[in-house]
């Protein structure tokens, strides 16, 4: 049986899932059915998801820039996520 590679847990790989969860949180908050405590928890989770999505977009943008530098099209190199700063 072939070994399965571990799932990619980079922000870019999780972007769609994070965005979908964020959209669901927003919908839940907009209904007004959440208590104050639930709303604060949802808001806190939403901020974390927003940051994940933002980081994923920055990494994707950097990856595209590295791979398609118009001044040096033959110098494309594989993307190394460890080179991206994760501080905010």
From Swiss-Prot:
GO terms for molecular function: exodeoxyribonuclease VII activity. Pfam families: Exonuc_VII_S. Keywords: Cytoplasm, Exonuclease, Hydrolase, Nuclease. One of its GO terms (biological process) is DNA catabolic process. One of its GO terms (cellular component) is exodeoxyribonuclease VII complex. InterPro entries: Exonuc_VII_S, Exonuc_VII_ssu_sf. It is found in: Cytoplasm. Residues 69-88 are annotated as: Disordered. It catalyses: Exonucleolytic cleavage in either 5'- to 3'- or 3'- to 5'-direction to yield nucleoside 5'-phosphates. The keyword Cytoplasm applies. Its EC number is 3.1.11.6. It is an enzyme of class 3 (hydrolase). NCBIfam families: PRK00977.1-4, xseB. PANTHER family: EXODEOXYRIBONUCLEASE 7 SMALL SUBUNIT (PTHR34137:SF1). Bidirectionally degrades single-stranded DNA into large acid-insoluble oligonucleotides, which are then degraded further into small acid-soluble oligonucleotides. Heterooligomer composed of large and small subunits. Belongs to the XseB family. This is Exodeoxyribonuclease 7 small subunit. It comes from Xylella fastidiosa (strain Temecula1 / ATCC 700964).
């Amino acid at each position: 049986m072939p070994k399965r590679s571990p799932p990619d847990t980079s922000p870019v790989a999780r972007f769609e899932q994070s965005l979908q969860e964020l959209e669901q949180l927003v919908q839940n908050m907009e209904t007004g059915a959440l208590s104050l405590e639930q709303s604060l928890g949802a808001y806190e989770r939403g901020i974390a998801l927003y940051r994940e999505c933002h980081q994923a977009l920055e990494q994707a943008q950097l990856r595209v820039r590295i791979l398609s530098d118009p001044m040096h099209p033959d110098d494309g190199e594989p993307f190394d996520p460890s080179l991206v700063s994760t501080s905010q």
